[in-house]
């Protein structure tokens, strides 16, 4: 029987050296949600930090799991699939929050399905779930330099930290990302897209 719980996954890499990198936007946003709703994390089978709690908005409540995979980015799907199977969570109750180089810093786009856009964490989840049909909160981090070695540039960019101006804006951006995930849960993806994609 399917669970009524939602699973909100923030993508990133575990460990102090990755904590403030662009690739950890998902972790940062899930931490914002955990802070808002007083949700505490515990270890799930060595695969993820997992928190369980309730969110309330406009008289509605929703039961949620917040997840930060500990598998490193490229194997994120293992953690998501394990939690999905263990708790019987439907695909349409999964929201994945991740960094996106195709969007400028501060922009948010919501989608379900479609291409992974070169994001290895999303590729892993698509592969493990055998489907791309879950909601995604794409959080812009801007694009790496296109000159020289594009692959090296990309790795250095996503594993690099935000500049001083962006760090000042980061709390507001993370709050927007958390708002977007909440809107998907309480109002549905279409309304959430109308609200956030046009910004």
UniProtKB/Swiss-Prot annotation:
Protein's job: Hydrolyzes ribosome-free peptidyl-tRNAs (with 1 or more amino acids incorporated), which drop off the ribosome during protein synthesis, or as a result of ribosome stalling.
SUPFAM superfamilies attached to this UniProt entry: Peptidyl-tRNA hydrolase-like
Gene Ontology CC terms: cytoplasm
Subunit structure: Monomer.
Active site location: 23
Main localization (coarse): cytoplasm
Species lineage: Bacteria, Bacillati, Actinomycetota, Actinomycetes, Bifidobacteriales
Site feature location: Stabilizes the basic form of H active site to accept a proton: 99
EC number: 3.1.1.29
Site (Discriminates between blocked and unblocked aminoacyl-tRNA): 13
Keyword tRNA processing recorded: no
Disulfide bonds: none
Record key words, sorted: Cytoplasm, Hydrolase, RNA-binding, tRNA-binding
Domain of life: Bacteria
Catalytic activity from the UniProt record: an N-acyl-L-alpha-aminoacyl-tRNA + H2O = an N-acyl-L-amino acid + a tRNA + H(+)
Protein name according to UniProt: Peptidyl-tRNA hydrolase
Designated gene of the protein: pth
Entry's family note: Belongs to the PTH family.
Gene Ontology MF: a single term: peptidyl-tRNA hydrolase activity
């Amino acid at each position: 029987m399917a669970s009524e719980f939602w699973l909100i996954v923030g993508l990133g890499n575990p460990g102090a050296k990755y904590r403030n990198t662009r690739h950890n936007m998902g972790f940062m946003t899930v931490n914002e949600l955990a802070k808002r709703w007083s949700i505490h994390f515990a270890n799930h089978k060595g695969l993820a930090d997992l928190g369980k709690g309730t969110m309330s908005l406009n008289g509605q409540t929703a039961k949620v799991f917040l997840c930060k995979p500990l598998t490193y980015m490229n194997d994120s799907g293992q953690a998501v699939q394990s939690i999905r199977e263990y708790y019987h969570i439907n695909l349409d109750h999964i929201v994945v929050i991740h960094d996106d180089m195709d969007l400028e810093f501060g922009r948010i786009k919501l989608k379900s399905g479609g291409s992974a856009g070169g994001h290895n964490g999303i590729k892993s989840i698509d592969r493990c779930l055998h489907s791309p049909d879950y909601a995604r909160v794409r959080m812009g981090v801007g694009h790496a330099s296109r000159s020289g070695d594009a692959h090296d540039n990309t790795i250095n960019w996503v594993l690099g930290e935000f500049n001083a101006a962006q760090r000042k804006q980061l709390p507001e951006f993370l709050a927007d990302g958390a708002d977007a995930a909440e809107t998907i849960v309480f109002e549905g993806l279409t309304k959430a897209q109308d609200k956030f994609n046009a910004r």
